[in-house]
């Protein structure tokens, strides 16, 4: 499988406190339409062996969004869209996604991933910096759900979201159909998020009880809700080994990375690796590092007490 990531542009209709992009990126980072189409066409030759993640900013705002889907649909690629889903509150927009991919495209090959920070409007809208955003996102997810999209709702764990993470997951589990799965992930404190550390940062020692309580609640009701939950971009040592069954195996895969801030030819870099990794001295003697996604570099850099974010695990 050829893995690729393209940020169509950094324009966004939200103003999230935990956005890992800088203000400069958001003001200046847009790919030219001809660059987008050239790169997508070049990648589409991999056909059904291509998995591409489409992101931003908010990718649905980009004028080339539907053109990209059309090219990828014809090549039968696996597609992941990272979006706040607010544009999908319009049923016609969802229909245009299906039309662009092609009516013979298998929607099981597409994932639509959206963050819901809290079931409480006041919390979610404050984190997005956008009044009414929770209502719009939920409406968008409803429309995607009705069309049988494989939707994944993500909770980005930080000091604010951790407090009602369990209740938020329970609400979403009961609200949506079983087409919708869930992800939990650690926060990348880069960009604007780094300016809001006092409000958002929580070390993994303090996060652990919230995460385990959330997983315990999910396990209690999972037979009724019947969907998958996965933990990504988070170290295994966050929780007791009992919960490791929820973790995605490490993300030490190289990507073909296309983004406005890539200064190479056609804004493309090959063999790019994630900034969430185990390349820290504290991880080297851990017996499970090869299975672990590791810690965001931004987290490692801001936490002076490394024992609060990395705990070596020896021979289970």
Regions found by a protein language model. Name each.
Residues 37-53, 62-185:
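Radical SAM/AdoMet-radical enzyme domain recognition
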Residues 12, 16-19, 214, 225, ...:
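Disulfide-bonded cysteines in secreted/extracellular proteins and peptides
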């Amino acid at each position: 499988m050829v893995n690729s990531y393209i940020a169509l542009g950094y324009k966004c209709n939200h103003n999230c406190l935990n956005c890992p992009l800088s203000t400069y990126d958001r003001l200046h980072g847009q790919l030219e339409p001809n660059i987008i189409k050239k790169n997508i066409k070049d990648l589409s030759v991999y056909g059904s062996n291509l998995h591409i993640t489409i992101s931003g900013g908010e990718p649905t705002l980009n004028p080339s969004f539907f053109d990209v889907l059309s090219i990828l649909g014809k090549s039968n690629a696996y597609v992941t869209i990272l979006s706040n889903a607010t544009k999908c509150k319009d049923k016609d927009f969802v229909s245009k996604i299906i039309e662009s991919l092609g009516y013979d495209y298998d929607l099981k090959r597409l994932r639509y991933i959206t963050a819901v920070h809290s079931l409480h409007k006041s919390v979610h809208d404050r984190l997005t910096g956008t009044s009414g955003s929770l209502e719009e996102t939920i409406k968008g997810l409803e429309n995607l759900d009705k069309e049988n999209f494989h939707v994944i709702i993500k909770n980005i764990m930080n000091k604010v979201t951790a407090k009602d993470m369990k209740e938020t997951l329970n609400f979403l589990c009961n609200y949506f159909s079983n087409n919708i799965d869930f992800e939990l992930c650690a926060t990348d404190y880069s960009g604007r998020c780094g300016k809001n550390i006092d409000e958002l940062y929580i070390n993994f020692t303090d996060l652990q009880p919230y995460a385990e309580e959330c997983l315990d609640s999910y396990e209690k009701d999972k037979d009724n809700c019947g969907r998958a939950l996965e933990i990504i971009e988070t170290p295994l040592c966050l929780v007791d080994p009992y919960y490791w069954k929820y973790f995605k195996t490490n993300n030490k895969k190289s990507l073909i990375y296309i983004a406005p801030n890539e200064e190479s030819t056609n804004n493309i870099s090959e063999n790019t690796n994630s900034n969430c990794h185990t390349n820290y001295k504290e991880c080297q003697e851990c017996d499970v590092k090869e299975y672990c996604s590791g810690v965001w570099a931004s987290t490692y850099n801001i936490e002076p007490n490394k024992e609060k974010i990395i705990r070596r695990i020896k021979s289970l």
